[in-house]
Amino acid sequence: MKGIFIAYDQAYNMEIADAMEEIGVRGFTMWQDISGRGSETGEPHLGNHAWPTMNNAILTFVPDDKVDDILAMIRAKDEETPALGLRAFVWNVETSY
């Protein structure tokens, strides 16, 4: 099992969750109106006068065989609109309840 944290510009709104459902991933936790700045490129998303945009984030836990499909979807969306900001981070989950 893997955990995937996806941070994205709020302009994507539910597009990320809807795309995950199309892949067969139903469960997730979403945070809205979070701030941040990418480590390499892109503008800050801080919700202030200088940087008014904000991010959302999703955390999902999926079987290993779903990871490549999710990352391919994320990569494709990011390549379509690179200025918005969209990143996914995957880590191992040893146990869950």
Question: Model regions: which residues?
Answer:
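Positively charged, small/polar-rich N-terminal and surface patches that mediate targeting and assembly
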Residues: 1-97
